[in-house]
Structure formats: C-alpha cells, structure tokens
Amino acid sequence: MHGESPIKRRESRKIWVGNVPVGGDAPIAVQSMTNTDTNDVAATVAQIQRLVDAGVDIVRVSVPDMDAAEAFGKIKQRVSVPLVADIHFDYKIALRVAELGVDCLRINPGNIGREDRVRAVVDAARDRGIPIRIGVNAGSLEKDLQKKYGEPTPAALVESALRHVEHLDRLDFQDFKVSVKASDVFMAVEAYRLLAKQIVQPLHLGITEAGGLRSGTVKSAVGLGMLLAEGIGDTIRISLAADPVEEVKVGYDILKSLHLRSRGINFIACPSCSRQNFDVVKTMNELEGRLEDLLVPLDVAVIGCVVNGPGEAKEAHVGLTGGTPNLIYIDGKPAQKLTNDNLVDELEKLIRQKAAEKAEADAALIVRG
C-alpha cells in the first residue's frame, strides 16, 4: 500500500491532445503507435481498440500519403481515443488530416519544406485547436547539424529541437510538445536534461528503436526511469519491436514503479527458491493473465515462504505468504489460511473482492470530495 511519489515534476505548460491533458499538473500520459497498414481501416481500428483496452491515453498513427490520410479520417470516426497523425515531407497531408479531425500533428518543421508550408500547417492547427509535436530523432538530424557535430550528440539533438521551437515561436504558436529521441540511452537522457532547462513546453519521452520486447523494455525502463525520477517528462512511449499493447503495459509498469501512475495490479513477488511452499512462478503467471482486466490500483504480494513473506504481505492490499498452510493477508492483517489446492482460484477471488471494495471506497471519496 504505497503512497504518493516523492518525485517533484518539472513545471511545464499544459496542452490538450483531444480530451487528454498533457503537461502542467496532468498525469503522465501513456502513448503507443499502431503498426498496421493505415489503409487497412478495420485492422487499424481493431489494434487501437486493443490499445484502449490496455489503458493507452494517446495513439499515434503513421500517415505517409493522401490515401492514408483519407483512411485516417475513417479511423478517427470509429475510435474515441485521441489520435496523433505522424506526418513527414508533404505538408498537404497535415492539412488534410487537420480537416478530418486529428487531435495532434507530429511533424518535423525541418522536412515539411518552405516557410509558407510550415505556416500553412501551423495556421490550420491554430484554427482548429490542434497541438503539434516536434519530433527530433538522432537518426534524422539535419545535414548541417551532422556536419557541425560529426555525429548525433545530445547537443545536436537539442539544437535541432530549439531550431524548430524558434520556428513555431516566430509564428506565435505555443501549443506544442517536444521529443528528442535516440536509441542510445545516455544520449537521449542527456538531450532531454538539456532541453528541459531551456523550454517550458511538455516533453514527450522515448528511447527510439529500443529493440525487441526484452531488450527494448530494459533500455526504456533505464532511460525513461532516470528522467522520470528527475521529474522530467509529460508523456511517454515505449518503442518496442513487439505488439504495441506491450508498449502500454511496460509504460504503466514504469510509471507504477515510480508511483507516478496507478492502474491495475502492482505485483510484488519473490523470484522463488527451494523454501517456497507453492509454485510462485506458475502462480504469478496465472494471476497476471487472469487479472489483466482489473483497473483498480491494488498492491498484491505473492511470496513463497515465511522469510520475507509476512513483511511484504503486510504492506499490500492482498498478500500471500507460503507456509503450512499458506496465509492470506488483507490490508496488512492475517485473514485466512489456504492450502495449495485451488490456490490461484481462491486468491483471484479474494483479489477481485478487494478490488471491488476499493473501487467502491474510492468512488465514495470522490463523491464526498
């Protein structure tokens, strides 16, 4: 039953991506991106719905051409979550998705083209209340910056970002957020640290092209964890070569670890050893699969023996300590004994019961507040 995060977040300007606040005092938003063919409207809508079910706050969709722009409009009509259109090179695509109700434009002013084209995009965004994300990436730095620095560096990423920020400043447009991504953890972290000191706009965090499910999760947890622990970051996206739903799960796990967001079960489990009185690994795998639908923030401890079990169980909403028999704790107090027979079924029932009680209590607090 862990408390609020001790992290003091960086002060930033609040913007709105659809109905989701970003920056200021808003919760850190979890974002993902579709990896379907945008022209396949049904497949893209289905994937977005899976992301929504996983708890995503904002979804980015690649819009590489005008056909995709028209498909984007159809997708937008069929989903409720805010959508970001990822636009490069052709400013007319940005203008079209603005007409079709996009919630945010992800552009790089440097590759949109002439000043008049950037102005046209900014004017369309301003007229419709659409924010912009300036997305700087180590893999696509401007040629003059590559020549100046010799290779991507934190300073190069920040100079690129500030160049685009100044571009929007000249057009008197402040409704934007910024990202400075790199696949190298140290480069990305230092770039965000430098940028955070120089602008007030929200920062979208990510380690780009982080890798597959395991390696990408580790890189993202290390990099984003460092920044978030320093109070830097207003939205996050975990870039994984995997099912985008995994990006959302990992994102929430990172935020839960830092007590920055609470959603669903926060499991505390031992790695198990020969002292375990039940199969901890099997029990955890079954519980995680069965309880994915629970949204109520709940701490659940699953400890295989009495060495650390009672201590961890007393700190959880629901705790299981291995023994002969096993002992269940509810809100830190011993509640009942369980044998290994039907252990997972009984534990699931108790967790769901506690989740329902907590949801009711939380709702009552909101009403009284």
Curated annotation (Swiss-Prot):
It catalyses: (2E)-4-hydroxy-3-methylbut-2-enyl diphosphate + oxidized [flavodoxin] + H2O + 2 H(+) = 2-C-methyl-D-erythritol 2,4-cyclic diphosphate + reduced [flavodoxin]. Pfam families: GcpE (PF04551). Pathway: Isoprenoid biosynthesis; isopentenyl diphosphate biosynthesis via DXP pathway; isopentenyl diphosphate from 1-deoxy-D-xylulose 5-phosphate: step 5/6. Keywords: 4Fe-4S, Iron, Iron-sulfur, Isoprene biosynthesis, Metal-binding, Oxidoreductase. GO terms for molecular function: 4 iron, 4 sulfur cluster binding; 4-hydroxy-3-methylbut-2-en-1-yl diphosphate synthase activity (ferredoxin); 4-hydroxy-3-methylbut-2-enyl-diphosphate synthase activity (flavodoxin); iron ion binding. Its EC number is 1.17.7.3. SUPFAM superfamilies: Inosine monophosphate dehydrogenase (IMPDH), Nitrite and sulphite reductase 4Fe-4S domain-like. Its cofactor is [4Fe-4S] cluster. Coiled coil: none annotated. InterPro entries: Dihydropteroate_synth-like_sf (IPR011005), IspG_bac (IPR016425), IspG_bac-typ (IPR004588), NO2/SO3_Rdtase_4Fe4S_sf (IPR045854). Binds 1 [4Fe-4S] cluster. [4Fe-4S] cluster binds at residues 270, 273, 305, 312. One of its GO terms (biological process) is terpenoid biosynthetic process. Converts 2C-methyl-D-erythritol 2,4-cyclodiphosphate (ME-2,4cPP) into 1-hydroxy-2-methyl-2-(E)-butenyl 4-diphosphate. Belongs to the IspG family. This is 4-hydroxy-3-methylbut-2-en-1-yl diphosphate synthase (flavodoxin). It comes from Pseudomonas putida (strain ATCC 700007 / DSM 6899 / JCM 31910 / BCRC 17059 / LMG 24140 / F1). The lineage of its organism: Bacteria, Pseudomonadati, Pseudomonadota, Gammaproteobacteria, Pseudomonadales. The gene is ispG.
